[in-house]
Amino acid sequence: MKPSSSNSRSKGHAKARRKTREELDQEARDRKRQKKRRGHAPGSRAAGGNTSSGSKGQNAPKDPRIGSKTPIPLGVTEKVTKQHKPKSEKPMLSPQAELELLETDERLDALLERLEAGETLSAEEQSWVDAKLDRIDELMQKLGLSYDDDEEEEEDEKQEDMMRLLRGN
């Protein structure tokens, strides 16, 4: 005999009670009343709307009717158009001025001193030094200048050539 199983089945599957016509009418009226109330409350635009955004440091709510205090010109004025200045490129220096700048460059001098002392430079520093020295060579060739060391070597070579010629004859 299983009285518990028959009781549990009846409790679990209880029929839902049907609503009467009056209850259904009352629910319909309530739904209609709720539908009429949808939308914003009357006067919400002037009442302050966003109280959370602007009133952190102020106690009094700000009146939304008060606008900006910046003056607005009432007359017709000509519109000033700004002309965009093109970015000026580095001014072209004369070869002489550029050569002087490169010869007095402190960074280049410091790196050359480090090289003479036997230190090894990083790849970036070495490439920078090489580029600057190449530019100095180009400028000196444009100006027709040469290193003092080169002049002495050329003179030595000329003297050696002359000595060879004299000995050979």
Curated annotation (Swiss-Prot):
One Pfam family named in its UniProt record? YihI
Q: Which GO terms describe its molecular function?
A: GTPase activator activity
Query: Some GO term, biological process aspect, for this entry: which one?
Result: ribosome biogenesis
Q: Please name the source species.
A: Escherichia coli (strain SMS-3-5 / SECEC)
User: Looking at the record, which segments are called Disordered?
Assistant: 1-100, 144-169
Query: What keywords would UniProt list here?
Result: GTPase activation, Ribosome biogenesis
What job does the chain carry out? A GTPase-activating protein (GAP) that modifies Der/EngA GTPase function. May play a role in ribosome biogenesis.
Q: Where is the composition biased (Basic and acidic residues)?
A: 20-30, 160-169
Which superkingdom heads the taxonomic lineage of this protein's source?
Bacteria
Similarity comment: Belongs to the YihI family.
Task: State the NCBIfam families in the record.
Answer: PRK05244.1-1
Q: Which InterPro entries match?
A: YihI
Biased composition regions of type Acidic residues, renumbered to the chain: 147-159
Name the record gives this protein: Der GTPase-activating protein YihI
| Oligomer status and interactors | Interacts with Der.
